[in-house]
Curated annotation (Swiss-Prot):
Name of protein: Large ribosomal subunit protein bL25
InterPro entries, alphabetized: Rbsml_bL25/Gln-tRNA_synth_N (IPR020056), Ribosomal_bL25/Gln-tRNA_synth (IPR011035), Ribosomal_bL25_b-dom (IPR020057), Ribosomal_bL25_C (IPR037121), Ribosomal_bL25_long (IPR001021), Ribosomal_L25_dom (IPR029751), Ribosomal_uL5_bac-type (IPR020930)
Gene responsible for this protein: rplY
Listed HAMAP family: Ribosomal_bL25_CTC
Source organism of this protein record: Chlorobaculum tepidum (strain ATCC 49652 / DSM 12025 / NBRC 103806 / TLS) (Chlorobium tepidum)
SUPFAM superfamilies associated with the record: Ribosomal protein L25-like
């Protein structure tokens, strides 16, 4: 997994401080690690957006003004419900020998027969997968081959563990639907109407 650098500044936690930072183009955030005190920081909104909206996951070197640098990853992000702007972020520190949990984006590859021959369309039900493993084993994205997926078929989390990178476990409910091939809406509605008429 690629590592990206992100400049950060320490911040004081005080009344209305977060709102003031946002007006200045900064996003309030925290840095934490098990057994250590949580550190309040701020990051440039533009730089953070590039990481948050990337199609890949990254390890992040948080770089402080005094030259200190620590390795982390984005654990959580909060968005404004109206503007969809990032309003807060959590960064989790890690060491290379510890197991971490993080969300990784899904990438699809292959020509889907359920689409090409069956006339269906691919429906992505979740866009990220929660993974658990050591940092060096974590992929930038999780690739799913859909070249054997027929119309009406669905891949669940339980189907994907076999293709996970060595040493990486997929978390979550095994029955969670990840990607499906569904009939176009008109066909689905016609089929439903036909079934109703027969009934």
């Amino acid at each position: 997994m690629e590592t990206r650098a992100l400049s950060v500044n320490l911040r004081e936690v005080k009344k209305n401080g977060a709102a003031k930072l946002r007006r200045l183009g900064q996003v309030p955030a925290v840095v934490y690690h098990k057994g250590e005190a949580t550190v309040a920081i701020s990051v440039e909104e533009i730089s953070l957006n590039k990481l948050v909206h990337s199609s890949e996951s990254h390890m992040i070197d948080l770089q402080y003004p005094d030259g200190k640098s620590v390795r982390s990853f984005i654990k959580d992000v909060q968005f404004d419900p109206v503007t969809d702007r990032v309003i807060h972020a959590d960064f989790q520190l890690f060491s290379t020998d510890e197991v971490v949990e993080m969300e990784v984006p899904i990438h699809l590859e292959g020509e889907c027969p359920g689409v090409k021959i069956g006339g269906g369309k691919i429906q992505i039900n979740v866009h990220t997968l929660p993974l658990k493993g050591k940092p060096e084993a974590m992929p930038e994205h999780f690739t799913i081959d859909v070249s054997a997926l027929e119309l009406g078929q669905t891949l669940h989390i339980r189907d994907l563990q076999a293709i996970a990178p060595e040493g990486v476990q997929i978390l979550g409910d095994a029955d969670t639907s990840v990607v499906s091939v569904v009939a176009p809406r008109k066909e689905a509605e016609t089929a439903a109407e036909g079934a109703t008429a027969e009934a």
